[in-house]
Amino acid sequence: TWSEFTEVLKKVQPVVEKKKGYALDMTFPTGEATIYYYAPFFWSNGGDFVSKDGLKVNGVFNSKENLETVNYFKSFLDNGYMSKVQITDLFESGRAAFKFDGAWEVNTIYNNYPDVNLGVAPYVVSDNWDGGRYTPTGSWAFAASSKTKKLKGATKLVQWMSGVESGKRLWDESKSFPSTYEAFESSPIFEEDENYKALYHQLSKYGHPRSKTPVYPQVSASVQEVLENSVLTDKDAKTELDKSVERINAKLKRYVMK
């Protein structure tokens, strides 16, 4: 839980400080990475970013649950557990105890940092977690253009690319996770390797899709901006959440106007 994780950070901080490091290797990069890495914190605390129909953000994006989550992140910097600026290879060099990253990081470390004693931990959940799904999902997607002249063939290709055999090949060639249970279960590594086994367990048991909304790009960018502005530049979290609602609403107008 959040409170348990905070206690762990307190204990490891003196150790990594001797190496001129931090307890956490944690950044808020632009693009899709930030919402992918940190949405689980919001979800496990009972928060979300848009309404179920994807057309409302006021009272959702700026909810009290989301404010609590942002303030929890702020406590990391306030207590010196993370750096205000990105430090290259902080975790990989042994100067950070924890790193938030995608499943692909396991393969990166196996190949490039074989001396790192890597362990995958479950996502940290809120003390208010109700046991629901909270782990981020999603990767490559395949689709046919609405203007394709070969719809039947394109449909078959998308079906194959989204299926078992394609998933197994994607894993073998690129280490991108499959999208079907059968593909996972046909690859022994997801049982034999403890880190990949832990990742599969998280995905299969707690996988949570990101928000479905016509203004998803604005939602994703706003999550990144709120965390960067609130945590790294110490702006008021509630003000930043409310500003994001205004920005997203400006884009939502075209979809909700009658």
What are these model-predicted stretches?
Residues 114, 121-122, 172-229, 254-257:
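Long, aromatic- and glycine/proline-rich binding clefts that accommodate carbohydrate-like moieties
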Residues 14-30, 83, 163-174, 250-258:
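Bilobed periplasmic-binding protein-like "clamshell/Venus-flytrap" ligand-binding domains
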Residues 3-58, 96:
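Extracytoplasmic/periplasmic solute-binding protein
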Residues 6-11, 53-84:
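Glycine-centered hinge/linker elements that transmit conformational signals in sensory
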